[in-house]
């Protein structure tokens, strides 16, 4: 069992939209032998669309909308370990932040992709905050070095300031843009030379940094600048130590170009070597160690309609400890029921295959026909455990959802229920007029919901404006005060889909006045309290 745990690497690739995250995922799959041709995501110039963007709407827009799970085996050159790599490719589009935050609860480490011309962007900052909260180790890949970009030292300073983490370069670019010659691999002390449009790294040369061979290969000026830069790197940044990376104090940095496969294999080789294998998972009752003999796992994502011919849901379960086995009975803790799974699956984006067993770190797809699962559910061999940390954040945009076809109200209801269980958005039912309000993190989610209701559930909806500032979950130890608050604010009170009380404030002023007037009421901005 320990051998199985040791060889697993479960991680997310995260970034701001268009920094090259899906492209990097595809290249990892290419090196892992999972796909023969990587589909460039950009506007589908290539007809083969990216493997990891598989919902119709994603293919149309060239952006990733929901987390894909992919896995492959990989043995680096010269290594005798076959690593089992589980990648979660997350949506970079800011409207899908909820899905991404949740994914970060199911991984042991993360790779952050940064565009070399743009540096750190808003989405990257938000996601890094979640990594910091959870002490998730990160590696940073600075992409698009074959385009004109910013000075590497400036980028490193910005990473340290904006992401609030110390960095340590493990590779260094030799020039950039049209003059880009390659990278010097500090971690392996090799020179990787760049030739555009090739499917593999062309020349890997073991060149001593002070030898004349270096001048011949990259030109005297470039060689002199490289020596100067590396001296500065060693002077400024502490020597790399794996333990400081694993404890999330230091982020190693690599440079390259994902589109041209450049610097990708170096990143992958170093990653599987240094990244942590599955780590302990915090439950409310105790910390669960991966090597415990009994199976435990939690649901971090639910996807409806992977197969449009069957209205079915798949619940994604992260195995936390023990060995998961097909057809074994497991306890669904929230419902107190025993369940067996006859066809658990593993994924390569849309292709899935049935498995007999899975180990800590693996992601297993469990068919969910009757809406059995909710996000955050725990499965065990009988122990009462509740895994923590799958919050919903307070949405920023709100609209009333109305039925546009009275003959299809049942389909609409089913569609809304399934999409909400999937965590696409949040549903609030106003207690005053009983109207349904959908709250999202971004505008695009409204389009996605409308599109999916029509295409997957054959139901039409329309949106109507509602002016709201924030939704906050409220609770109080003083029942009388809580009742008084609900009476006074009754037209602003709603229930979320779990039946919890939510106060819908229509302005920042109203919210701060409510907090002042009702001292014994706690206002929460995430559902995890």
Regions from the language model: what does each represent?
Residues 1-529:
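Structural and coupling elements of P-loop NTPases
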């Amino acid at each position: 069992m320990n051998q199985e745990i040791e060889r697993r690497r479960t991680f997310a690739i995260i970034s701001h939209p268009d920094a090259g995250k899906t492209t990097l995922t595809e290249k990892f799959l290419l090196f892992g032998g999972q796909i023969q041709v990587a589909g460039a995501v950009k506007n589908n110039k290539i007809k083969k669309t990216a493997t990891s963007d598989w919902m119709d709407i994603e293919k149309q827009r060239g952006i990733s909308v929901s987390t894909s799970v992919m896995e492959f085996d990989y043995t680096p050159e010269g290594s005798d370990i076959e690593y089992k790599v589980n990648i979660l490719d997350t949506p970079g589009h800011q409207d899908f932040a909820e899905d991404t935050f949740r994914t970060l609860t199911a991984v042991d480490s993360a790779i952050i992709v940064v565009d070399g011309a743009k540096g750190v962007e808003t989405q990257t900052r938000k996601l890094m905050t979640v990594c910091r909260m959870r002490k998730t180790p990160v590696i940073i890949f600075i992409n698009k070095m074959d385009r004109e970009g910013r000075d590497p030292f400036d980028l490193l300073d910005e990473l340290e300031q904006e992401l609030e983490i110390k960095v340590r370069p493990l590779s260094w670019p030799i020039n950039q843009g049209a003059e880009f010659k390659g990278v010097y691999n500090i971690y392996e002390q090799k020179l990787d030379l760049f030739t555009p449009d090739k499917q593999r790294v062309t020349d890997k040369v073991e060149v001593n940094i002070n030898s004349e061979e270096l001048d011949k290969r990259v030109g005297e000026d470039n060689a002199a600048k490289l020596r100067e830069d590396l001296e500065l790197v060693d002077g400024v940044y502490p020597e790399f130590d794996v333990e400081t990376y694993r404890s999330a104090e230091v982020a190693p940095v690599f440079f390259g170009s994902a589109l041209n496969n450049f610097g990708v294999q170096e990143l992958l080789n170093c990653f599987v070597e240094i990244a942590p294998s599955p780590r302990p998972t915090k439950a409310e009752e105790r910390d669960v160690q991966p090597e415990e003999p009994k199976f435990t796992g939690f649901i971090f994502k639910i996807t409806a309609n992977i197969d449009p011919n069957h209205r079915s849901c798949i619940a994604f379960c992260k195995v936390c400890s023990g060995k998961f086995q097909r057809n074994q009975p497991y306890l669904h803790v929230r419902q107190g029921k025993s369940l067996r799974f006859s066809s658990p699956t593993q994924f390569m984006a849309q292709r899935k295959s049935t498995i007999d067993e899975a180990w800590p770190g693996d992601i297993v797809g469990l068919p969910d026909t009757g809406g059995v699962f909710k996000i955050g559910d725990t499965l065990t061999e009988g122990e009462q455990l509740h895994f923590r940390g799958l919050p919903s954040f307070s949405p920023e945009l709100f609209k009333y959802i109305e039925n546009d076809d009275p003959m299809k109200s049942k389909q609409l209801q089913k569609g809304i229920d399934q999409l909400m269980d999937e965590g696409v958005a949040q549903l609030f039912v106003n207690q005053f007029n009983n109207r349904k309000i959908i709250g999202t993190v971004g505008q695009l989610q409204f389009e996605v919901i409308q599109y999916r209701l029509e295409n997957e559930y054959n139901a039409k909806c329309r949106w109507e404006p509602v002016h709201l500032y924030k939704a906050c979950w409220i609770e109080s130890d003083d029942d009388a005060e809580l009742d008084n608050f609900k009476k006074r604010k009754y037209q602003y009170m709603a229930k979320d889909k779990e039946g919890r009380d939510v106060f819908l404030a229509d302005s920042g002023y109203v919210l701060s006045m409510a907090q002042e007037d009702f001292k014994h009421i706690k206002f929460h901005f995430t559902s995890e309290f």
